[in-house]
Amino acid sequence: MKKIQFFDTTLRDGEQTPGVNFDVKEKIQIALQLEKLGIDVIEAGFPISSPGDFECVRAIAKAIKHCSVTGLARCVEGDIDRAEEALKEAVSPQIHIFLATSDVHMEYKLKMSRAEVLASIKHHIHYARQKFDIVQFSPEDATRSDRAFLIEAVQTAIDAGATVINIPDTVGYTNPTEFGQLFQDLRREIKQFDDIIFASHCHDDLGMATANALAAIENGARRVEGTINGIGERAGNTALEEVAVALHIRKDFYQAETNIVLNQFKNSSDLISRLSGMPVPRNKAVIGGNAYAHESGIHQDGVLKNPDTYEIITPALVGVDKNSLPLGKLSGKHAFHTRMEEMGYTLSEQELKDTFKRFKQLADAKKEVTEEDLHALILGQSSESTDNFELKHLQVQYVSGGVQGAIVRIEERDGALIEDAATGSGSIEAIYNTINRLMKQDIELIDYRIQAITAGQDAQAEVHVVIKDNNETEFHGIGIDFDVLTASAKAYLQASGKSKSTTKQVDFEEVK
């Protein structure tokens, strides 16, 4: 039985999804949940890309105690040095170095010859090996690279000290047959194949990321890279929950085992979905809302008689609890804390105290507080107080001629209160125009989405917005409140605060 490592890049590649920007606190929360999930390696970010990303990688490296943390680096000594500095407090640090090997990348992006690429790989892998015990090399755009040159590049990296070789399908170009053959070719040509950990990193542009990852495992890969919910740029990455459950359900075929705690997938999926603002499609494999629903009468009858008739995955396997009891105003702090831990949240004593106080306020306003409400409670607490701004007062009024007016008061981090007013063709536009004046920003609203967290007249509203600033960078915000307008204001303020406080990244080539 072979052991498959799981490498999660939600915090790096997943964050390249347009509109997805996790702050430091959110990244640490996600990383701690990934640790509970049993992920072997967490790719925390790209340390050289910005001071903000460096601090995130350093904070995660310090917080994680039971799995490896890695950072991305180009074949540049400065990148490697920066990664070493960011990861120095990690219990088990690794580094992930990449350089493109396809002709189109070498000619048009790198402007390097094959000989120059090989020399760079040799030098920088050797340089990194002096600083890290585990060095992973990725030949970017491997599946569109000349096969003979790809093998030469991989051999060069191994000879220079690489301990992990990752094969990226950077643009989602390959298919399972071709990808499996690529690993067979590597096994045949690379004499140290069994001594090195080979990995796959697949994108879902043609809808084959999971199938390609499984084909790699079938043909010798011992590490799979991907993200929770498959988030990522363009069509996304390999969904790790799909690979893990496939290996578990079809252990007879793949003969593989992992460290993954399968019943933590639902918590992981919910957390990342809400923090990223990307809802999980109801028909999503493994963790979608319809994954365990049966509408056909024949199917329903069969499932009631014996679930094995139409269910190969039990809901409990991935942490879907259909019998979770709601909390209420009589629930105590211990029960609340236990439920928070079951849902994947790690709270400090002060955070627990503050959150429990808000829970009691919510329980007074609602008959029952469901798990969805509790997720919203945590996210609402985070979204109401951004890095520098907090919504203190909102007033909306009808002006004349169908025009709406809004008065907004915001508290800055230093305690100063700022207030302004503006008008708009509707209440939402008036509120957002006012916030733009207060923040002194010219930003564009790209997406606005509202949903009820639970059913019933006492449901809270959850608003997600995506904005774009003058640098064409997109930011996501979440707002939660019983009042739709207040939730809308909180969401927009959070996104605006992220835009205002985010340090712009160095203008690098897009990392795949």
Curated annotation (Swiss-Prot):
<keyword id="KW-0464">Manganese</keyword>
<dbReference type="InterPro" id="IPR013785">
    <property type="entry name" value="Aldolase_TIM"/>
</dbReference>
<feature type="binding site">
    <location>
        <position position="237"/>
    </location>
    <ligand>
        <name>Mn(2+)</name>
    </ligand>
</feature>
<comment type="similarity">
    <text>Belongs to the alpha-IPM synthase/homocitrate synthase family. LeuA type 1 subfamily.</text>
</comment>
<dbReference type="GO" id="GO:0005737">
    <property type="term" value="C:cytoplasm"/>
</dbReference>
<dbReference type="GO" id="GO:0003985">
    <property type="term" value="F:acetyl-CoA C-acetyltransferase activity"/>
</dbReference>
<keyword id="KW-0479">Metal-binding</keyword>
<comment type="function">
    <text>Catalyzes the condensation of the acetyl group of acetyl-CoA with 3-methyl-2-oxobutanoate (2-ketoisovalerate) to form 3-carboxy-3-hydroxy-4-methylpentanoate (2-isopropylmalate).</text>
</comment>
<comment type="pathway">
    <text>Amino-acid biosynthesis; L-leucine biosynthesis; L-leucine from 3-methyl-2-oxobutanoate: step 1/4.</text>
</comment>
<keyword id="KW-0028">Amino-acid biosynthesis</keyword>
<feature type="binding site">
    <location>
        <position position="13"/>
    </location>
    <ligand>
        <name>Mn(2+)</name>
    </ligand>
</feature>
<dbReference type="InterPro" id="IPR002034">
    <property type="entry name" value="AIPM/Hcit_synth_CS"/>
</dbReference>
<dbReference type="InterPro" id="IPR050073">
    <property type="entry name" value="2-IPM_HCS-like"/>
</dbReference>
<dbReference type="GO" id="GO:0003852">
    <property type="term" value="F:2-isopropylmalate synthase activity"/>
</dbReference>
<comment type="subunit">
    <text>Homodimer.</text>
</comment>
<feature type="binding site">
    <location>
        <position position="201"/>
    </location>
    <ligand>
        <name>Mn(2+)</name>
    </ligand>
</feature>
<dbReference type="InterPro" id="IPR005671">
    <property type="entry name" value="LeuA_bact_synth"/>
</dbReference>
<feature type="region of interest" description="Regulatory domain">
    <location>
        <begin position="390"/>
        <end position="512"/>
    </location>
</feature>
<feature type="domain" description="Pyruvate carboxyltransferase">
    <location>
        <begin position="4"/>
        <end position="266"/>
    </location>
</feature>
<dbReference type="Pfam" id="PF22617">
    <property type="entry name" value="HCS_D2"/>
</dbReference>
<feature type="binding site">
    <location>
        <position position="203"/>
    </location>
    <ligand>
        <name>Mn(2+)</name>
    </ligand>
</feature>
<dbReference type="InterPro" id="IPR054691">
    <property type="entry name" value="LeuA/HCS_post-cat"/>
</dbReference>
<keyword id="KW-0100">Branched-chain amino acid biosynthesis</keyword>
<dbReference type="GO" id="GO:0030145">
    <property type="term" value="F:manganese ion binding"/>
</dbReference>
<dbReference type="InterPro" id="IPR000891">
    <property type="entry name" value="PYR_CT"/>
</dbReference>
<keyword id="KW-0963">Cytoplasm</keyword>
<protein>
    <recommendedName>
        <fullName>2-isopropylmalate synthase</fullName>
        <ecNumber>2.3.3.13</ecNumber>
    </recommendedName>
</protein>
<dbReference type="Pfam" id="PF00682">
    <property type="entry name" value="HMGL-like"/>
</dbReference>
<dbReference type="Pfam" id="PF08502">
    <property type="entry name" value="LeuA_dimer"/>
</dbReference>
<keyword id="KW-0808">Transferase</keyword>
<dbReference type="InterPro" id="IPR013709">
    <property type="entry name" value="2-isopropylmalate_synth_dimer"/>
</dbReference>
<keyword id="KW-0432">Leucine biosynthesis</keyword>
<dbReference type="InterPro" id="IPR036230">
    <property type="entry name" value="LeuA_allosteric_dom_sf"/>
</dbReference>
<dbReference type="GO" id="GO:0009098">
    <property type="term" value="P:L-leucine biosynthetic process"/>
</dbReference>
